Amino acid sequence: MSRIGKLPIPIPKKVTITIEGQKVTVKGPLGELSRVLPPEIAVKEQENTIIVKPQEQSRRARQRYGLCRTLVANMVEGVSKGYEKRLVIQGVGYRAQVQGKTLVLNVGYSKPVEMPAPEGINIAVENNTNVIVNGINKELVGNTAAKIRAVRPPEVYKGKGVRYAGEVIKLKAGKSGKK
């Protein structure tokens, strides 16, 4: 039995859950998410909690059991609170701006890099150097933030580039030179 999978998922008051076979739909104040779970996983709603259990004792069911519980818990938290990732742009002349639903990054390339925001994701910029990605789908928020970071990952000598807020870049020493 999975230690994570055994835990019941509490349902906040403003969130409603619909279970139709293997499809779980979660509605809340921020929006609606749905996901189809694998056939070897059973989902039940009891009182104000959701319980995820394996339908069979196969190896595959045990592998996916904790994952499915976490995915449903992330959906519940997403529609009630939402998710946010912050990125910091560091470097001389490096900056970001939002034009409509598109993020425009000037990070040292000959042309600005334009990144359209996926459906359900909001991108905001503070002070031209702080990018905020938020939405209700944890997976989509994380993937969007990772794509923005991948445009110009932090380099190890000066630390220039796009990094997550709170991420520590271990800087290397440059060449020693002749004495």
Swiss-Prot record:
Known partners and oligomeric status: Part of the 50S ribosomal subunit.
GN (gene name): rplF
GO molecular function annotation: rRNA binding; structural constituent of ribosome
Endoplasmic reticulum recorded as keyword: no
Function comment: This protein binds to the 23S rRNA, and is important in its secondary structure. It is located near the subunit interface in the base of the L7/L12 stalk, and near the tRNA binding site of the peptidyltransferase center.
Key words of the record: Ribonucleoprotein, Ribosomal protein, RNA-binding, rRNA-binding
Any single biological process term in GO: cytoplasmic translation
Gene3D superfamilies in the cross-refs: Ribosomal protein L6, alpha-beta domain (3.90.930.12)
Family: Belongs to the universal ribosomal protein uL6 family.
Keyword rRNA-binding part of the UniProt annotation: yes
Record's protein name: Large ribosomal subunit protein uL6
One GO location term (cellular component): cytosolic large ribosomal subunit
PROSITE patterns with a match to the protein in the record: RIBOSOMAL_L6_1
InterPro entries referenced in this protein's UniProt entry, alphabetically: Ribosomal_uL6-like, Ribosomal_uL6-like_a/b-dom_sf, Ribosomal_uL6_a/b-dom, Ribosomal_uL6_bac-type, Ribosomal_uL6_CS
